[in-house]
């Protein structure tokens, strides 16, 4: 018996045949304006939303409902005094915020925001550029933004910013690997790494449901990628003030702050493109043909990215910060093995479906359910690691990992050798005195004999 593979469907890529230089310029300017406008909206929505979730009003002074609060904050940053540390590496100190902002704004260059539309008589897709490896471009640019954080923390020659930079590099390495593995399953199912073709592949069903475990892994990893609660260890206020941004002021701090919110929009756009059908209308509106054409796609794309933005804001309002060891264990001991296991399953099923005609959504849905059930069983039966004994309950020796440390509340300080010798000498003297006193008392007061 000879097994003949079925033809892999090829999805239509974005058509840039009528693209001109001025159309590309208009799109580039539009993307910058779109991102800045959405950052201003995100600041207002987040602060008002957090206020409602925490039973407080939120910003309500600058303009109606506090709508102009973000503009007031931006103006304040523009006119603040520009300061830096005396020992800072000036060139890298000024360059680092620019690198972070450039990397953040560059991701949207390959994000399809809508189908082909007519602009001044030219048919062009609502996408600045596309390439066969556009998804790899997104991952590469996201990694480039890490240099802005690391260089910013190191160039200040200050302790807390350096701690934040090191934490951020460890965090990105830990979670970007899991995020990349979750996207590989999308590449296998779509048969391409072009973002426009990945969106075209989701015309009938979204990968968020077919590849649900990969979608969950991406959402968790993306939250860690943008340093948001519960993964905001590089900027933990109670531990290292503001992390790598501690020694920055004025608009250099503003660039970092802007890039953080643009990165939130970036991970939301990537989630929309890879898992939520891109600019396609949601079911059941997707069956109406004109709702999947023209400028309607822009509306669906906008609503979908704001769905993910709301999830990021919601998690910040409800979840607590992870402890650092819990955070690293989740990335390396949980997400990485799960992502690898799911990728192997996707590759096997994808290979089978090339030789056997099966319904892909039903097949992957059933495999995904079985995979999740297996994970739940493993999670329930897995014995938790013993919690470390708090330092306040451990025997205090005066040293921790070879370094002298002061005692914590509840611990008894260890006496120095001189104090110990003094205490031992005093105790010996007191013991000898007590013994002599008891002996003298026994001699002076002998026991009376018994009557016979």
Predicted region positions:
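Selective transmembrane helix interface/packing segments
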Residues: 2-434, 438-452
């Amino acid at each position: 018996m000879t097994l003949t593979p079925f033809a892999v469907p090829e999805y239509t890529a974005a058509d840039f045949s009528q693209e001109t230089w001025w159309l590309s310029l208009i799109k580039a300017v539009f993307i910058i304006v779109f991102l800045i406008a959405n950052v201003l909206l995100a600041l207002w929505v987040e602060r008002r939303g957090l206020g409602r979730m925490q039973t407080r009003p939120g910003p309500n002074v600058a303009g109606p409902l506090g709508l102009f609060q973000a503009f007031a904050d931006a103006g304040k940053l523009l006119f603040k005094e520009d300061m830096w540390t005396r020992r800072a590496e000036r060139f890298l100190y000024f360059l680092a915020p620019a690198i972070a902002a450039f990397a953040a704004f560059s991701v949207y260059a390959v994000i399809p925001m809508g189908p082909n539309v007519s602009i001044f008589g030219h048919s062009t897709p609502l996408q600045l550029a596309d390439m066969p490896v556009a998804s790899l471009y997104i991952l590469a640019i996201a990694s480039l933004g890490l240099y802005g954080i690391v260089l910013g923390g190191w160039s200040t020659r200050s302790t807390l910013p350096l701690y934040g930079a090191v934490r951020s590099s460890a965090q990105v390495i830990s979670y970007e690997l899991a995020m990349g593995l979750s996207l590989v399953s999308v590449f296998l199912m779509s048969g391409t790494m072009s973002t426009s073709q990945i969106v075209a592949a989701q015309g009938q069903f979204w990968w968020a449901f077919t590849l649900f475990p990969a979608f969950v892994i991406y959402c968790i990893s993306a939250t860690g990628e943008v340093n948001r609660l519960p993964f905001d260890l590089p900027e933990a206020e109670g531990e290292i003030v503001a992390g790598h941004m501690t020694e920055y002021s004025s608009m250099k701090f503003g660039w970092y702050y802007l890039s953080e919110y643009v990165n939130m929009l970036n991970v939301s756009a990537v989630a929309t493109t890879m898992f939520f059908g891109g600019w396609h209308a949601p079911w059941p509106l997707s069956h109406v043909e004109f709702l999947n054409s023209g400028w309607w796609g822009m509306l669906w794309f906008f609503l979908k990215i704001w769905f993910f933005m709301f999830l990021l804001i919601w998690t910040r309002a409800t979840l607590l910060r992870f402890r650092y060891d819990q955070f690293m264990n989740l990335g390396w001991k949980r997400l990485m093995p799960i992502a690898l296991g799911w990728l192997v399953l996707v590759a096997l099923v994808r290979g089978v479906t090339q030789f056997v005609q099966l319904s892909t959504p039903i097949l992957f849905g059933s495999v995904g359910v079985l995979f999740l059930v297996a994970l739940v069983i493993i999670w329930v039966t897995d014995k938790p690691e013993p919690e470390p004994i708090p330092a306040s309950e451990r025997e205090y020796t005066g040293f921790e990992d070879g370094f002298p440390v002061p005692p914590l509340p509840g611990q008894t300080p260890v006496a120095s050798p001189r104090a110990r010798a003094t205490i031992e000498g005093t105790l010996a003297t007191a013991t000898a005195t007590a013994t002599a006193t008891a002996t003298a008392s026994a001699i002076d007061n002998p026991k009376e004999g018994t009557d016979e």
